Amino acid sequence: MTTFSCVMVGNESLLVECAKVLVQRGHQIRTIASRNADIIAWAGTVGIPVVAPGAGLEARLTPGFDWLFSIANLSVLPEAVLSMATKGAVNFHDGPLPRYAGLNAPVWAL
């Protein structure tokens, strides 16, 4: 399997579950951008640096990662951040977009 490097952005527990899968499969998470205390604590236990999301995020990230994963993230990421990923950016949202954008998407989809 070919491994890759990534940056993850988000503030929900789904980010940690996805990150665990990536780590188990040998992929490198370079940085997590989050304000969530549980995510920050988990990242600390596995040695992944955490930065604050928001304005100026591109200045807090080190260029050269393959993928950017935005997971259950409610903020729009600027082009300056999206373009840092050499292979692309993926938005993981737990409901069909754009019809069920926003909060509680799984419930609305039902």
Feature roles, as predicted:
Residues 1-110:
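One-carbon transfer enzymes
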